Amino acid sequence: MPKFPSKEWVAEFHDAVNGSGAYAKAAENWEGDFYFVVEPEGEMSEEAILYIDLWHGKSRGASMVADRSEKSPEFVISAPVSVWKKVIEVKLDPIQGMMTRQLKLKGNMVKIMKAVKAAKELVNCCTMVESEFPV
């Protein structure tokens, strides 16, 4: 069971996205990449940055990033690890999380609101990865 966040978790998430017919259909017109910034809590001592490049229903690449300056993604979503845990365990809807600022978004919220089904299917891909959390 990979720890969240880790390069092993990101690799399994990438594979889950690319193996999901539901995500492929929901995101067939999506073009955009993300940083998912995991703010430290519990056993975590520093932030972790997960990068994923999503293009027409597939992940073109996903990795851990050491520094925010490595890439310039269209979207950055930040939250403490406990909030990410709620999202991955489907206890917090990601759109609701952004609207209530539990998940902090940098990027075009309108574009994300037009792709609600894709966002929900992306979370479903997260649930396919058995995860161990530091909180």
Name every feature range the model reports, one short phrase each.
Residues 1-135:
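Feature captures hydrophobic
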